[in-house]
A protein has these predicted regions:
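Cysteine-nucleophile active-site neighborhood
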Residues: 1-48
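Amide-donor transfer/coupling interface in amidating biosynthetic enzymes
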Residues: 28-131
Length: 131
């Protein structure tokens, strides 16, 4: 289980402050939000800080009992781009749809912070403990 940077570390490579090798547990990369092609008024603020919705893309035991579109707390400037779309458990829209939760076999991680996400976040932690 990983949160925020813990999610990002699971992937092959990160481009945060250079090019850095990740753990390679999941294939893919970590990139910065880039809204340079939009007008100033259309650009979401980076870092992405605050509450946003997570939309479930597949049944996942860690998301059991969580409403689709539930709000979670985010604080990040980078996001993961998995090579395999089948690992994406949930997505979030912040100027683009990005993977906000991934799940494969016994690996589960979120870009959001369950520990700061009140009842929904506690439910995810309870689901983990209950496995």
């Amino acid at each position: 289980m990983g949160f925020c940077l813990g999610l990002q570390l699971l992937f092959d490579v990160s481009y945060e402050y250079g090019r850095h090798k990740g753990l390679g547990i999941l294939p893919g990369k970590v990139v910065r939000f880039d809204f340079a092609d939009r007008t100033v008024d259309e650009r979401p603020r980076v870092p992405h800080i605050g509450w946003n919705q997570a939309w479930q893309k597949q049944p996942c035991p860690m998301l059991r009992g969580i409403d689709n579109g539930e709000y979670f707390y985010f604080d990040h400037s980078y996001y993961v781009v998995p090579d395999d779309a089948h690992v994406v458990a949930a997505t979030t829209d912040y100027g683009l749809d990005f993977a906000s939760a991934v799940w494969k076999d016994n690996v589960f991680a979120t870009q959001f912070h369950p520990e700061k996400s009140q009842a929904a976040g506690l439910r995810i932690l309870e689901n983990f403990v209950g496995l």
